[in-house]
Amino acid sequence: MPDFSMSNLAVAFSITLAAGLFTVLGSGLVMFSKTPNPRVLSFGLAFAGGAMVYVSLTEIFSKSSEAFAEIYDKDHAFAAATMAFLAGMGGIALIDRLVPNPHETLDAQDPSFQESKRRHIARVGMMAAFAITAHNFPEGLATFFATLENPAVGMPLALAIAIHNIPEGISIAAPVYFATRSRKKTVWACLLSGLAEPLGAALGYLVLQPFLSPAVFGSVFGVIAGVMVFLALDELLPAAKRYSDGHETVYGLTTGMAVIAVSLVLFHF
């Protein structure tokens, strides 16, 4: 397996950090902006979902199979990659079951939300931050390892996760800001949650680095592919559909796939 230089590690970590910091952008939309156009939001979420699905199934899963092929024959390598992919989906589904993502439960326009006591709203914000932070750890690990092995794969994935992090920031910022009216506390809540991604990357690398091998890389990339596909299908696409009854979701989905497909072709040249 490749021996990564400090510059490789720095680039991968920086891209992971940048993707995580997009959570803070969500706080800015809550504090300073008007309500975003639902159709634009729908398109953007679907775009991110399409990008994540495409890059996961065409590039990241292939990297898993290629890594396993260094120790198994082609058929067994594909089977091992498939098992890792399914394990990734199962693992993130379990996390989602134990710590549900609060996207669907937070709506600043809901009357019951507006009328709740500030202490209760603050507690909702803390729960949202905790839940999203738990989901951010595997996302950070995915971005870091994908970029570390091949920036042509990692950068499109980081872009998709960055877009995905904006509504997550809104989910945290809305209850915190309405409860405290403090921009500082709101930004800090989003920042701490976003930093879970580079933290997940750093911890994951420190734990796995002594054991890096074709089997480990194959397992990591297979799990990453499964996690990303699950997140796209479970969070991004349903959220995109909720914001629009038109064709914005399918347009965003196909555009995201097309843009990532073209970018990957260009990277290969």
UniProtKB/Swiss-Prot annotation:
What membrane topology does this protein have? Multi-pass membrane protein
**Listed GO CC annotations:** membrane; plasma membrane
Q: Where are the transmembrane segments?
A: 12-32, 41-61, 75-95, 126-146, 152-172, 187-207, 211-231, 249-269
Residues bound to Fe(2+) are: N136, E139, N165, E168, E197
Q: Which reactions does this protein catalyse?
A: Zn(2+)(in) = Zn(2+)(out)
UniProt GO MF annotations: metal ion binding; zinc ion transmembrane transporter activity
**Which positions does UniProt annotate for Zn(2+) binding?**
E139, H164, E168
List UniProt keywords, sorted A-Z: Cell inner membrane, Cell membrane, Ion transport, Iron, Membrane, Metal-binding, Transmembrane, Transmembrane helix, Transport, Zinc, Zinc transport
Main location class: membrane
Q: Where in the cell is it found?
A: Cell inner membrane
Q: Name one GO biological process term.
A: zinc ion transmembrane transport
Similarity field = Belongs to the ZIP transporter (TC 2.A.5) family. ZupT subfamily.
Role summary? Mediates zinc uptake. May also transport other divalent cations.
Protein name (Swiss-Prot/TrEMBL)? Zinc transporter ZupT
Q: Which organism is it from?
A: Neisseria meningitidis serogroup B (strain ATCC BAA-335 / MC58)
Identify the coding gene: zupT
